[in-house]
Regions:
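Bacterial N-terminal signal peptides
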Residues: 1-10
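Catalytic domains of carbohydrate-active enzymes, especially glycoside hydrolases
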Residues: 46-68, 94-101, 278-285, 334-345
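Aromatic-lined substrate-binding rim segments of carbohydrate-active enzymes
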Residues: 51-57, 64-121, 239-244
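Polysaccharide-binding and catalytic clefts of secreted carbohydrate-active enzymes
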Residues: 121-291, 295-298
Length: 501
């Protein structure tokens, strides 16, 4: 691959600060399922001495060890630390830092607290309900016990959310773990437990069954989405506060995934906002680098998260579990520029994925300069439309609305760089703080968002559909202005260039 000269490595424009990988215990995985067997093969044997030596040579500095409450306390009041003791010692002996991927939202069989319960089938999941106050008591107790045992040996803590992968949101039908829920599916009707129902009854007289059947009025539909997304965000922040109290010296992270937001049970920007109200010492990681195998579309999700991170004040990171992303040269170029364009501070990749890459791609992640993007254009994330779409098809698994947004935003990225903001971010002052002069609406603007744009228009801000921007250059070159330099990516040649501002 042709590479332009990297000329700036100042205190401001540093390469990616941290490179992480992870380990999943074999005893957690249901290898009778093909995806489970793949996870076991790729992730359960990566902390043996030879593999740790490989990762250290590739620039990895931290190994995240998965710790699941389901396995840690199978007998009430009796913690089994044997496996984690062994794994921590292995990572330390390999000269890498120890991180924890804390899945304390998956209870052991004896636990009698509330879990998510779907309304459509009146069936529980095996994931703690964030509406149940006892869920925070669990976090307090298990984080406390873990910190007491390992202390400063733990350098990094990946804070739990409420979804299957420890992300914010609702269950999503994961089947490849031994603790996976027998009943699980993607929908927004996971508000059927008694605490969620009681919380909803305090703000609405409309039965939840009416809402998830798509029969509620517009105001109630929007209220319902705010109801569950707000709880998801606040739960993450409350758990983060507990983890910080127990591990005050540590670095922290939280994963955000799934292409859709409200259909998945949360709002990315709101999660970031609530976390930053606790502390900005956290890296929020988008979990699908290069997921569309094309920079213009894949970067939409990364920039959505990065925009909120820049605005609310925390660091941005990315991760992937795709074996080919950094192995195939063309995909590597697209994924690499996604990291550059979004000033990625922390990168995560699995051992097997890094191993499949050539030597150049293994090391290049730590070579790119990192500097925050600077932009005066913002694309509206159609959060109101996504809410209404989610409620209209509450028990559907389709993400067509999200796909339409990604397609349109991806096409517009060929013409201009941009931030991505939603109605809440505008209300919080995003456009003014980030120096936005032009807002691009790729869909009709709903009245709720139009109301928040009134001040922007009054200050002379321009709102357009994007057609007034110059057409894409030929040949296509993506351009990002950073605080310290300008970066460009030419997909036809694979060249990533850096220029002085």
């Amino acid at each position: 691959m042709a590479m332009g000269m990297i000329f700036v490595l100042t205190a401001v424009a540093q390469p990616i600060a941290h490179y992480h990988s992870r380990h999943i215990p074999a005893e957690h995985i249901n290898d009778a399922i093909p995806f489970g067997l793949m996870c076991k093969t790729n992730l359960s044997y990566c902390i043996e001495p030879d593999k740790l030596a490989d990762m250290k040579s590739w620039g990895v500095d931290t190994i995240e060890l998965r710790l699941v409450w389901w396995a840690l306390e199978k007998e009430k009041g009796v913690f089994d630390w044997l496996r984690l003791d062994r794994d921590v010692a292995k990572v330390e002996a390999g000269g890498l830092k120890v991180g924890l991927f804390t899945w304390f939202h998956i209870p052991p069989a004896w636990y009698e607290g509330e879990t998510f319960r779907c309304i459509a089938h009146n069936q529980p999941s095996r994931t703690l309900s964030p509406w149940d106050p006892a869920a925070l008591d669990v976090a307090e107790r298990i984080y406390g016990a873990t910190a007491a045992r390992y202390g400063r040996r733990i350098d990094f803590v990946y804070v739990i959310g409420s979804a299957d992968y420890g992300e914010p949101g609702f269950p999503h039908a994961v089947k490849h773990y031994k603790f996976s829920s027998p009943h699980s599916h993607k929908s927004i009707d996971w508000t059927g437990d008694r605490y969620a129902r009681a919380a909803w009854a305090k703000i609405s007289d409309v039965p939840l069954e009416t809402v998830i059947a798509g029969k509620a009025d517009r105001a109630t539909a929007l209220k319902y989405c705010d109801f569950y997304s707000d709880r998801s965000a606040r739960y993450c922040a409350e758990v983060f506060a507990i983890a910080r109290k127990k591990f005050p010296w540590a670095r922290f992270g939280l994963p955000v995934g799934h292409h859709s937001e409200y259909p998945s049970g949360y709002n990315r920007a709101e999660v970031i906002k609530r976390l930053c109200e606790v502390s900005t010492n956290i890296t929020v990681r988008w979990t699908d680098i290069g997921g569309f195998r094309d920079f213009s579309q894949s970067s939409v999700f990364a920039r959505r998260v990065e925009s909120a991170c820049q605005f609310y004040g925390c660091a941005f990171g990315e991760e992937t579990s795709h074996p080919l992303i950094f192995g195939e040269e063309n995909l590597s170029n697209h994924a690499s520029y996604e990291l550059v364009a979004n000033a990625t501070e922390m990168l995560h990749n699995d051992y097997s994925c890094i191993r499949t890459a050539g030597d150049r791609n293994r090391l290049r992640m730590r070579e790119f300069p990192r500097s925050a993007p600077v932009c005066d254009v913002a694309v509206l994330f159609p959060d109101i439309d996504e809410k209404l779409s989610a409620v209209a098809r509450a028990t559907s698994t389709g993400d067509r609305f999200t796909e339409d947004f990604v397609r349109k935003a991806g096409e517009f990225r060929k013409r201009s760089d941009y931030w991505i903001c939603d109605t809440m971010m505008i209300k919080d002052g995003f456009l003014e703080k980030m120096g936005v002069k032009k807002v691009v609406a790729l869909f009709p603007i709903p009245p709720e968002t139009e109301k928040e744009l009134a001040g922007f228009r009054a200050r002379g801000g321009v709102v357009s559909d994007g057609d007034d921007f110059p057409p894409p250059p030929d040949p296509l070159v993506y351009r990002t202005v950073h605080r310290d330099f300008i970066s460009e990516f030419c997909p036809s040649t694979g060249e990533i260039r850096f220029k002085r501002r």
